[in-house]
Design a protein with these regions (language model features):
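Interhelical loop/hinge segments that connect adjacent transmembrane helices in multipass membrane
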Residues: 1-7, 197-235, 252, 291-292, ...
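N-terminal membrane topogenesis motif
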Residues: 1-27, 118-123, 147, 200-201, ...
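Alpha-helical transmembrane segments of multi-pass membrane transport and lipid-handling proteins
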Residues: 19, 84-109, 299-328, 337-351, ...
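Alpha-helical transmembrane segments of multi-pass membrane proteins
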Residues: 100, 113-141, 167, 318, ...
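Membrane-interface helix-loop junctions in multi-pass transport and translocation proteins
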Residues: 152, 160-194, 367, 377-409, ...
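Membrane-proximal transmembrane or re-entrant/amphipathic helices at the cytosolic face
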Residues: 446-508
Length: 508
């Protein structure tokens, strides 16, 4: 048996798979935009997708919050059976909003957008119930594989599921219209589950029907799954709340806000999301429980994350309008870019959160994280109500940023106590350093892009990226080294996959 990979290698593999999976999601979004445009039907679809996303967030949280519960059991596979039974309970409960209450929920989500939007949302909710079941089961299987130090196969399975979803969407769109999106997600989710289940079977897992049958304790485990996800769940609930306010800005606004949030999620998953998934099993097994021992990993994760995030934000600022205008009109392209930039500060907050979140989950402080999440939903509702008065999606983006800032501060206080202020000072220093280097690289590129017009902006963005790499290597050698430790194994893995003989795969 090979030695366990380093955290950096596993983070890189996970980041690579998450980026690939999210990129496939971007392809789906692009197909929707090109095939169906930006109208009441797409608003209804994305309203339903927001609710489905709540269940996806619950599912994905299993990969960090439930790993410790699976790892501490004498038999990971027996524990997996029990939690699959709990997933069955959750799936049945999800039928209430997605099936039974589909019509009233669709009316609530689409505000005054009309009957066409309501019908699209209602039908999508019903179909996405099945896709949600696949997501719940798949994430639990991925958590079980993480306990075995298996990260490449789950990543590849999610990517394969995305490819299947795209193929199904393109094939079914002429027949089913906008509902081909929801059905495509169902088919892709089933493919993801099948691939991970096959890998577990190869590792010796034998599903036990008796072990999966929900009993009196299954309801308690289902509640634990939701409770453990409450902290991260709040982010998606806040998105659904904000989407409702976006609907008040008129037809097409929810679709644009969804695209902005999707881009934000793409960058988030490839940085903070990947690090959190990989940190969970390692920290659960090795952490000594002292807050002081978290300082070093927190700083390393934060430095690596900032070094990856800065060029992302810079490229969006310089080339975003030009790229977005390829599929949107110039006004919508500007709004989309500005909204993403308004949200982008949340990426900085997010790369500070993996270590505190995993530490709190390892301590079993699910209630505290849930309380922070609830605070975020309430705050987001209030800030969105104010922001919508400005008649601007960008204002809604800033509202999301302020909500994230408040939540991040509270989580640091919960993790480090009075030492949180020292931690904040250290993190603030790192932000200033990386921001200064980013400004040196991208501000000239931004001005040259403005002067040269949109045709020149992508070239200037590339120039800014090259300048950032050169400056970071010179002025921030430690940050650059950490970023390389994260990205290097991913590039090496890519080369090995490309050179692998036919029939070999990521899980081989």
């Amino acid at each position: 048996m090979s030695e366990p990979r380093s955290m950096a290698a596993n983070a890189a593999i996970t980041a690579l798979s998450q980026v690939a999976s999210m990129a496939l999601g971007a392809v789906i979004a692009l197909v929707i935009l090109l095939r169906f445009g930006k109208d009441a039907e797409t608003d209804g679809l994305f309203a339903a997708y927001g609710v489905y996303g709540v269940l996806v967030v619950v599912a994905q949280s299993f990969r960090t919050t439930i790993v410790a519960r699976l790892a501490e059991d004498r038999s990971t596979f027996a524990a997996l059976d029990r939690y699959l039974g709990a997933v069955g309970v959750l799936f049945a409960a999800a039928a209430i909003p997605l099936l039974v209450l589909a019509e009233p929920l669709a009316r609530l989500l689409t505000a005054d957008l009309g009957r066409e939007a309501v019908d699209a949302a209602r039908t999508s909710l019903m179909i996405l119930w099945f896709a949600a079941g696949a997501q719940l089961a798949g994430a639990l299987l991925a958590a079980a594989l993480a306990v075995r130090d298996e990260f490449a196969l789950p990543g590849a399975a999610y990517v394969a599921g995305g490819v299947v979803s795209i193929i199904a969407l393109i094939a079914l769109a002429p027949v089913l219209g906008i509902q081909a999106v929801a059905l495509g997600l169902c088919i892709g989710g089933a493919a993801t589950v099948a691939l991970m289940l096959l890998r577990l079977l190869r590792l010796g897992y034998r599903p036990s029907a008796v072990g999966m049958v929900p009993d009196r304790t299954a309801v308690g485990r289902a509640a634990l799954l939701v409770w453990a996800a409450a902290g991260t769940l709040s982010t998606q609930v806040a998105f659904v709340v904000t989407l409702g306010f976006a609907a008040q800005l008129g037809e097409g606004a929810p679709t644009l806000y969804t695209y902005a949030t999707f881009l934000f999620g793409l960058f988030l998953a490839s940085t903070a999301g990947a690090m959190t998934i990989v940190l969970a099993p390692r920290l659960a097994e090795t952490w000594d429980g002292r807050s002081e021992s978290l300082h070093a990993p927190l700083l390393e994760v934060f430095r690596a994350g900032l070094t990856l995030i800065a060029p992302i934000v810079g490229v969006i600022a310089v080339a975003g309008p030009a790229v977005a205008s390829l599929v949107l009109d110039s006004d919508d392209a500007r709004v989309l870019t500005d909204t993403v930039l308004a949200m982008s500060g949340g990426l900085v907050l997010a790369v500070a959160m993996p270590v505190p979140l995993v530490a709190l989950y390892t301590r079993g402080r699910y209630a505290a994280v849930a309380a922070v999440g609830l605070q975020g939903v309430v705050l987001q509702f209030g800030l969105s109500a104010i922001a919508v008065g400005f008649d601007s999606l960008v204002a809604l983006g800033f509202a999301s940023l302020l909500t994230g800032l408040a939540g991040a501060i509270v989580l640091l206080l919960l993790t480090f106590g009075r030492g949180a202020w020292r931690v904040l000072a250290l993190l603030g220093r790192e932000v200033l350093l990386v921001a200064a280097v980013g400004a040196l690289a991208f501000v000239p590129a931004l001005w040259l892009g403005v002067l040269g017009g949109r045709a020149l902006q992508p070239v200037m963005a590339l120039g800014g990226l090259v300048a950032f790499v050169a400056l970071a290597r010179w002025l921030l050698p430690r940050h650059w080294e950490l970023a390389q430790r994260v990205a290097g194994p991913a590039l090496g893995r890519l080369r090995r996959w490309r050179s692998a003989p036919a029939g070999a795969g990521p899980g081989a």
